[in-house]
Regions:
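Hydrophobic beta-strand scaffold residues
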Residues: 8, 91-92, 149
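Conserved N-terminal subdomain of the carbohydrate kinase-like
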Residues: 1-63
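A short, aliphatic-rich alpha-helical micro-motif
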Residues: 52-56, 112-113, 143
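Structural recognition of alpha->loop->beta junctions
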Residues: 4-7, 106-128
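Short beta-strand/loop segments at the ligand-binding rim of alpha/beta enzyme cores
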Residues: 87-95
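Distinct, well-ordered alpha-helical segments
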Residues: 49, 75, 101-112
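Active-site beta-loop-alpha junctions enriched in small/polar residues
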Residues: 66, 96-98, 124, 154
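Conserved phosphate-binding/catalytic region of the ribokinase-like
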Residues: 82-86, 106, 135-182
Length: 182
C-alpha cells in the first residue's frame, strides 16, 4: 500500500484500555456476507490526532464514517476537512453503514456540504442519507452536494456521479459469487 503512495501515518495508541479493532465476517454459500465489527481503540479518534502537516502534504484525505460516532471524532473530522480545504486538498468520505447514516444524517450532510469532494456509499447508505424512496432521486441530491460520488449497487453495478452527470458502471459477469465483502 505504501508503494502505491498511500500513507498511514498513525502511531500506535498508548495507555488505553481499549483493544485493537476487529471485524468478524461470515460468508454464506451464496456469497453474501454479514459483518460484526468492534471498532476498539479507533473510537478514540480526536482532534489531537489530526496532523495539519500530514494533511497539507497529502493529495487526498480519506475519512471513515464508522469513526463518526463520538463528539471528539466529529470535531476531528471537521478539523481535517477545514485544514484540507484551506490547503486545496481533496477530502473523501465513506458513509460506511446505513445505520451509521441513520444516527448521524444531519451532521453527515453538513460535513459533506462543508467540503467533501468525494463521497463513497452503497445504495442503502445513500437512500438513508437523503431519506428518499428511489436511487435516482438520491443521485440528484448527491450531485448537488459533492463533486464526485461513487455509489455501489451490488449486482446492479455502480454509478459514478460527477459534474457531467451520472455514469452507470455495469457489473462484471461472474459465474459464481464467492464473497461479497467489499
Amino acid at each position: 500500500i505504501g508503494a502505491a503512495g498511500v500513507a498511514f501515518n498513525t502511531a500506535a495508541a498508548e495507555n488505553s484500555d481499549l483493544a485493537t479493532s476487529r471485524s468478524l465476517i461470515l460468508v454464506t454459500p451464496d456469497g453474501q456476507r454479514t459483518m460484526n465489527t468492534y471498532l476498539g481503540i479507533s473510537t478514540d479518534f480526536n482532534r489531537a490526532e489530526v496532523d495539519p502537516a500530514v494533511i497539507e502534504a497529502s493529495n487526498y484525505v480519506y475519512l471513515e464514517g464508522y469513526l463518526f460516532d463520538r463528539d471528539e471524532a466529529k470535531a476531528a473530522f471537521r478539523q481535517a476537512v477545514d485544514i484540507a480545504n484551506k490547503a486545496g486538498r481533496q477530502v473523501a468520505l465513506t458513509l460506511s453503514d446505513s445505520f451509521c447514516v441513520d444516527r448521524h444524517r444531519k451532521e453527515f450532510l453538513e460535513l459533506i456540504r462543508s467540503g467533501i469532494a468525494i463521497l463513497f456509499a452503497n445504495e442503502s447508505e445513500i437512500l438513508s442519507l437523503y431519506e428518499c424512496g428511489s436511487f435516482d432521486e438520491a443521485v440528484v441530491h448527491v450531485s448537488r452536494d459533492t463533486k464526485l460520488a461513487v455509489l455501489t449497487r451490488s449486482e446492479k453495478g455502480s454509478v459514478v456521479v460527477s459534474e457531467g452527470g451520472p455514469i452507470p458502471v455495469a457489473p462484471d459477469a461472474v459465474q459464481k459469487v464467492v464473497d461479497t465483502t467489499g
